[in-house]
């Protein structure tokens, strides 16, 4: 029998589809406000780069006193700026280790509520940094908002995945990525010089991140806790029943609870795993490797190099209005995330991920060719725009949304929090490497920098083709049980796997 309230067998063997209730909509919307902040703080640092660097220089001059001040050395300015960008990822790396602990201790909903303290503190520090003439405050604020985003990157997919019906789990899981890209787009638009990207208003631009945090603080108390957490982890049948009634809109949820009881009995043989226990578990080795590689495929694809440095990339490519081209990329980003929302339950996770990786690889090669020929063929600047827009579009078809929620699908309730922590750490570590190192690698490799990403994308495509299963339409229990019945990834003969052969139809289907 399928586990969880997501899929419930009917008398004729066909599972009825749970309707979308107002409570479910409110809960998902409230949760993904955190993802909106995550995206906003990825994109907000890009457009005002020059005015923030000017502020850094003014602070540097002011600290030297009136006698013989000299401008900040270019190397020091580059390091300060790279740190301002990349410290966001350091915060995410550190906090991602706490996802499992906090989500088990406080619960999914309360953990998201408490997490907003970091968002308010980080946003306040960034907003007041210029008035205090302190680039250290801005860097600390970026660190705190990164720590907030690190927790969000695990808590939101976990919560949404546990409250979503099976037939909508992919689409609702993709809303996490949609909120991220909308946040990026909002930051890019507000960062224009005609709006908040000015020498006097950039602190307001960075500080606005406190607004969605405050809205989430208002809305989340009206949302139910995950019934899976309440019943399976906390053994609270009454609150779990109440939560299920609100989420499903059904007066009788006894069938759902029966399935949760069945899953709980199975999980009593599989206690919640600590991080070290998960890393040492042969049973979970295969899904863990898949989860980590999928996270690496997202970050090492080069997408955040485009988000962090898109304006300077367009300038290098000879685009006349790079800020507007960057916003164009943000619009493409949002539109194709919506496409992914519509396709993920039809085409499946694996197919979309493969399509996205292949398309990004082709666009990275096209971008390299355009940059190489730019001096001889000025029209190549338009080709570079098409290449970056295509790069972003294919990212949002697959590598953008798929890795986050597929990790939650690959693990049962016991190891899921620890698995989200490992996946989050992998994602944030690679994010930090790109954020800190891309500027230096781009200077060293010149037009060939995107060729490096093309090679990585090809490697991730091959891994996905050979090893990543299709999870569409499967319950958490089915997917987890399938991995328990197969040998470790390291012990298997390498062969293409369009769908795990042991993920056959449930006998009640």
Swiss-Prot record:
In its keyword annotation, does this UniProt entry include Lyase?
no
Q: Which Pfam families match?
A: Sugar_tr
Tell me which residues are glycosylated: 57
What UniProt notes about the protein's domains is: The dileucine internalization motif is critical for intracellular sequestration.
Residues with Phosphothreonine modification: 486
Question: What segment(s) does the record annotate as region Interaction with SRFBP1?
Answer: 7-13
Q: How does the protein associate with the membrane? A: Multi-pass membrane protein
An example GO CC term for this entry is:
insulin-responsive compartment
Instruction: Quote the protein name from its UniProt record.
Output: Solute carrier family 2, facilitated glucose transporter member 4
Q: Which residues carry this modification: Phosphoserine?
A: 10, 274, 488
GO function terms (MF aspect): D-glucose transmembrane transporter activity; D-glucose uniporter activity
Which disease is reported for it? Type 2 diabetes mellitus: A multifactorial disorder of glucose homeostasis caused by a lack of sensitivity to insulin. Affected individuals usually have an obese body habitus and manifestations of a metabolic syndrome characterized by diabetes, insulin resistance, hypertension and hypertriglyceridemia. The disease results in long-term complications that affect the eyes, kidneys, nerves, and blood vessels.
What reactions does this protein catalyze?
A: D-glucose(out) = D-glucose(in)
Q: PTM comment for this protein? A: Sumoylated. Palmitoylated. Palmitoylation by ZDHHC7 controls the insulin-dependent translocation of GLUT4 to the plasma membrane.
Q: Report the superkingdom from the record.
A: Eukaryota
Q: Which family does it belong to?
A: Belongs to the major facilitator superfamily. Sugar transporter (TC 2.A.1.1) family. Glucose transporter subfamily.
Fill in the misc note. Insulin-stimulated phosphorylation of TBC1D4 is required for GLUT4 translocation.
The cysteines joined by S-S bonds are none
Give residue spans on the Cytoplasmic membrane side.
1-24, 103-111, 164-171, 223-287, 345-353, 406-417, 467-509
Name the gene: SLC2A4
Q: Where is the motif (Dileucine internalization motif)?
A: 489-490
